[in-house]
Amino acid sequence: MEYLNTAQELLDFIMRCKSPFHVVKEAGDLLNENGYTKLEETKEWSLVPGGKYYVTRNESSVIAFQIPESAFSSYQIIASHSDCPTFKVKGEDPFVTDGHYTRLNVEGYGGMIRSPWFDRPLSLAGRMVVRDGNGVKSVLVDAGRDLVTIPNLPIHLNRDINNGIKYSVQTDMLPILGDETAKDHFYELFLPDTAKEDILSMELYLYNRVEGSIWGASKEFLSSGRLDDLQSAFGSLKGFLAAKATGQVNVCAIFDNEEVGSLTKQGADSSFLTETLQHINAACGKDTIAYHRDLADRKSTRLNSSHLARSRMPSSA
């Protein structure tokens, strides 16, 4: 049953992809393994027929492409996104203390259902920017263990809990990190060998530590956190790597910030894709008219999570 192997591969991919930065790192590793060359937006590109390349922006979006062996006259594009509904730590003011506990000061990120986040083992992953000699560098970080939780009130303190509750992120859902001293050694959880004053900024996201599973009488179902939209990122990458460019440039784009409108410099509504295609066009010796003609003949597919049927409430399908 080959589909079970693919399903497990997807679940393993999701468990490694704990933030948009980790998604792009995983995508880059997979592309490197398949003979792709990383390019830089700030440098001149030298492309060859049959070449395979990729470029990243903000370390959270990636565009990979294959140049056909012969001349091309269009682009074939598949797109998905690297971010997921979650909670993001407020980097400028990350802690809330009340004399007993240290909580993380978080904001809701994307279109989430809030209730499943309660009473689960959660952790943090993302990126920190640190001093590096006379400059700075970014470092991927992951606590890698059960670190925080968002506890529900017990039923005897909230008798209406089964009658429908409206949760406020700011008052009901700040994750407990530890006792009142926890903030003093927070950064050591991620970069134990880096002085606190050398950590200049951070972008940290909560993630669910519960592993996904394959279930059902015939193992026909799959459940996991971050399916939106990592199942699409995984599927588009696998399909892209299996395809061969013939007569068109094959493009696989995974954008960040779809969950919050795509308007950032690395979002789908940014210049990233357009400028990448213009780079390809120029490096292949084609003029502006040829670029617009090729673009007009492009084929684009956007992958995202959707609903075919609603198993819990069939009447709403």
For every predicted segment, state its role:
Residues 1-302:
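N-terminal hydrophobic/helix-forming segments and targeting peptides
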Residues 303-317:
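Single conserved hydrophobic/aromatic residue that forms the stacking wall/gate
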